[in-house]
Amino acid sequence: MEVILRNAVDKLGHPGDIVSVSPGYARNFLIPRGFAYEATQGNRKRIAFEKSRLEALENERIAAAQAIADKLAEVSVTFAARVGEEGKLFGSVTTADIAHQLEAQGFKIEKRQIELNEPIKTLGVYRVGVRLHADVHPEIKVWVIKQ
């Protein structure tokens, strides 16, 4: 049985994909839970129209994210922190701290969008990625200086 996916389904496909699945899987799982609908001729035409509309929306999102990325490329964030011996901080600089500083500079970036593997615990200059969109990942400079 062929179905059109409404949502991404692991190991099956992305929204708008037409996939072939067993009738039981479609009737008992995918369709009742709203993950897919039957691939009739009318639904195929509708999905073609929706794909073009979604593609236009996605292009707008990418353009907006790229505009923010261009502004972020010029931004640096500075933290003045108390330092112990060997340049180690008392505490650390986290994604929440960076997001708060960016918000103070007029950017609406959530802490989960900031790509920092572990909190910063030493003095220095760090390049930190910001995930604005799946295709747009600008980097900002984070300066950690002695207070």
Swiss-Prot record:
Protein function: Binds to the 23S rRNA.
Keyword presence, Ubl conjugation: no
Domain of life from the UniProt record: Bacteria
Protein name per Swiss-Prot or TrEMBL: Large ribosomal subunit protein bL9
GO molecular function, one term: rRNA binding
Paired cysteines (S-S): none
Entry similarity comment: Belongs to the bacterial ribosomal protein bL9 family.
Keyword Plastid: no
Pfam family, one: Ribosomal_L9_N
GO terms classed as biological process: translation
GO cellular component, one term: ribonucleoprotein complex
Keywords in alphabetical order: Ribonucleoprotein, Ribosomal protein, RNA-binding, rRNA-binding
Organism the protein comes from: Gemmatimonas aurantiaca (strain DSM 14586 / JCM 11422 / NBRC 100505 / T-27)
